[in-house]
Amino acid sequence: MGAAGSSALARLGLPALPGPRWLGVAALGLAAVALGAVAWRRARPGRRRRLQQVGTVSELWIYPIKSCKGVSVDAAECTALGLRSGHLRDRFWLVIKEDGHMVTGRQEPQLVLVSITYEDDCLILRAPGMDQLVLPTKLLSSNKLHDCRVFGLDIQGRDCGDEAAQWFTSFLKTDAFRLVQFEKNMKARASNEIFPSLDKNYQVAYPDCSPVMILSEASLADLNTRMEKKVKINNFRPNIVVTGCSAFEEDTWDELLIGNVEMKKILACPRCIMTTVDPDTGVIDRKEPLETLKSYRLCDPSEKSIYKSSPLFGIYYSVEKIGSLKVGDPVYQMVQ
């Protein structure tokens, strides 16, 4: 049955039994897999493709406020705009300057020290030397609407109030800041504005480029074999972490099924100076791990017009079919 079959039995709370009893359990497991595959094919009658398991979900992350710490979750909905757990939405909050321009860890590296928990429909924000901030996830419609700029594109956000603004201003101590929230009735940023040269069709709120980013544990482990000072998964801020595959195997995954969510590859994730911010100290290095990645993860020369000199690490995906997923779910590549 192999490791994958044994882990499936463990998730069901069943021991891996020897002899005929084991065969009976295995038969039940195979039947369940077959029924699931049949159900998937029936749900997608026009797309006759087979499923090839390429890994397993080991971690799920939602980053409510852009550049602040992520929240690890066991399960999530996957919407067209990214992961969601209750009122926690991925990159639905954004720190801005008073003129509306976004502020990220690239400009204010200490943002990565802001931790977030979720209680009673509120985000609870904590940071070194600061009292906690209780932030309601449902804002008054009378709160001001800001016209914001995210990577040169216009997008709106609703002001989270003076208390939140003062909290971030006091913590960062470099400028006057506001916090805004994206709302579902607002116009998101369109893929044809983000990547005009690519034939893609999706939208995002405040993420850099895509609703979902996937990275494998093996790719991180490979990078760390080349690093004097090891880096963490938090340096790269993926939404979905995959185990059970080889390093950089995710480069080859074009279309995925996880839980009942279907995703389609947009492009590889070009890495920037944000990866050099230490998630534990908020100190920006400006060199590593970026320099090491550049030594072996640059794009093919034919793709330089897209990626330029940025090293590639992780993959951006659009959500083709919304649904739910959880830690422990198999990751299937959908192949012809």
UniProtKB/Swiss-Prot annotation:
It comes from the Eukaryota. It is a peripheral membrane protein. Keywords: Isopeptide bond, Membrane, Mitochondrion, Mitochondrion outer membrane, Molybdenum, Oxidoreductase, Peroxisome, Transit peptide, Ubl conjugation. Pfam families: MOSC, MOSC_N. GO terms for biological process: cellular detoxification of nitrogen compound; nitrate metabolic process; nitric oxide biosynthetic process. Ubiquitinated by PRKN during mitophagy, leading to its degradation and enhancement of mitophagy. Deubiquitinated by USP30. PROSITE patterns: MOSC. Its cofactor is Mo-molybdopterin. It is found in: Mitochondrion outer membrane; Peroxisome. It catalyses: N(omega)-hydroxy-L-arginine + 2 Fe(II)-[cytochrome b5] + 2 H(+) = L-arginine + 2 Fe(III)-[cytochrome b5] + H2O. Binds 1 Mo-molybdopterin (Mo-MPT) cofactor per subunit. Component of a complex composed of cytochrome b5, NADH-cytochrome b5 reductase (CYB5R3) and MTARC2. Catalyzes the reduction of N-oxygenated molecules, acting as a counterpart of cytochrome P450 and flavin-containing monooxygenases in metabolic cycles. As a component of prodrug-converting system, reduces a multitude of N-hydroxylated prodrugs particularly amidoximes, leading to increased drug bioavailability. May be involved in mitochondrial N(omega)-hydroxy-L-arginine (NOHA) reduction, regulating endogenous nitric oxide levels and biosynthesis. This is Mitochondrial amidoxime reducing component 2. It comes from Bos taurus (Bovine).
